[in-house]
Every structure is written in structure tokens, then in C-alpha cells.
Amino acid sequence: MATTSSKVTVTTTAQTIASIDNVTQYVHLHSKGATYIGNSGVTTSTGFLLDNGDKLVITIPQGCELNAVASAGSHDLYVLTTRVD
């Protein structure tokens, strides 16, 4: 089991925050602004909203990825990922 942490600057351009992997990943998110998460085509219309200060733990199945986009400007998203080998 490997754990990594990062601070991602989320902008109005969607970006990958948990890459495709060959194992299940547990991803802990702490948003510091309005962040929308979802698949590779995530938008502010289709994503799941994390408001400023929200925290979420999500399981990403093998072969899937998680992406994020901001509603406006840019802000930080703290990410802690644990890979289950």
C-alpha cells in the first residue's frame, strides 16, 4: 500500500487529480474553493460539487481516473491518495 499527498491548483480547465491505475485507489479531497469532480469530461454542469472547505473520500476503481475543474479563477485542492496493491 502506497500513499501520496499533493496540493493541486484547480483552474477552469479540467485536469486529472487521480490518474488511471491498475489498482483501486482511495482518494481523500479537501477543497479550498468551488471544485467540480468527475470523469475526463468534467464540467461545472456535469461534475459533483465540492464547496469551499468540503472534504470527501472517494474510491476510484482500477482503470478509472478522477478529474477536477474550478467554477471560476483558481484555488487549491489537497489530495491524499492511497493505492491498494
Predicted regions and their residues:
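Edge beta-strands of extracellular beta-sandwich domains
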Residues: 76-83
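Viral virion structural and adsorption modules
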Residues: 2-4, 68, 83-84
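Surface-exposed ligand/attachment interfaces on beta-rich extracellular proteins
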Residues: 1-23
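Short loop/turn segments at connectors of secondary-structure elements within structured domains
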Residues: 4, 73-76
